[in-house]
Amino acid sequence: MPRSQRNDNFIDKTFTVVADILLKVLPTTRREKEAFTYYRDGMSAQAEGEYAEALQNYYEAMRLEVDAYDRSYILYNIGLIHTSNGEHAKALEYYYQALERNPYLPQALNNIAVIYHYRGEQAIESGNSRISNLLFDKAADYWKEAIRLAPTNYIEAQNWLKITNRLEEAI
């Protein structure tokens, strides 16, 4: 039984019902409907922390989905799972792939920045300030782009850019 048919959560059930109605009403192909079902099931599994199941659903959705914009969100969610699992290099690959298909995805830019910032912090702990500055500069570049796309979001990043004197080149 597909995950979407066994949701216990009221919000998930409501989303599933609305999505099913839209899929019936909108002119979409069978393949597009199937891709969306896998994507929806992936989101549901991901929300419950069932990452292996979520990845299986996302990979199946990727196999079926042809629209670049829709694929960008699938790739972004795969990146989120790898980030949650501490697999930052793999997460970056998926965030970059998502941005190739949809350059207007500020949340992917933000997550890339967070990973570079984290790596910068690790470099400081290792006593390598030169590398940390390079990583922080890279994080700043991605945060500036995310802020440009979504100016009211990422307040903590904006504050960090100000505190570290990296805001001047921003916005």
From Swiss-Prot:
Subcellular location field: Plastid, Chloroplast thylakoid membrane
GO biological process: photosynthesis
Keywords (A to Z) from UniProt: Chloroplast, Membrane, Photosynthesis, Plastid, Repeat, Thylakoid, TPR repeat
GO cellular component: chloroplast thylakoid membrane
UniProt repeat feature TPR, residue ranges: 35-68, 72-105, 120-153
InterPro entries, per database record: PSI_Ycf3_assembly, TPR-like_helical_dom_sf, TPR_rpt
Tree of life domain: Eukaryota
Any single Pfam family the record assigns to this protein: TPR_1
Membrane topology annotation: Peripheral membrane protein
NCBIfam families: PRK02603.1 (NF002725)
Family of this protein: Belongs to the Ycf3 family.
Role description: Essential for the assembly of the photosystem I (PSI) complex. May act as a chaperone-like factor to guide the assembly of the PSI subunits.
HAMAP family: Ycf3 (MF_00439)
Name used for this protein in its record: Photosystem I assembly protein Ycf3
Organism lineage string: Eukaryota, Viridiplantae, Chlorophyta, Nephroselmidophyceae, Nephroselmidales
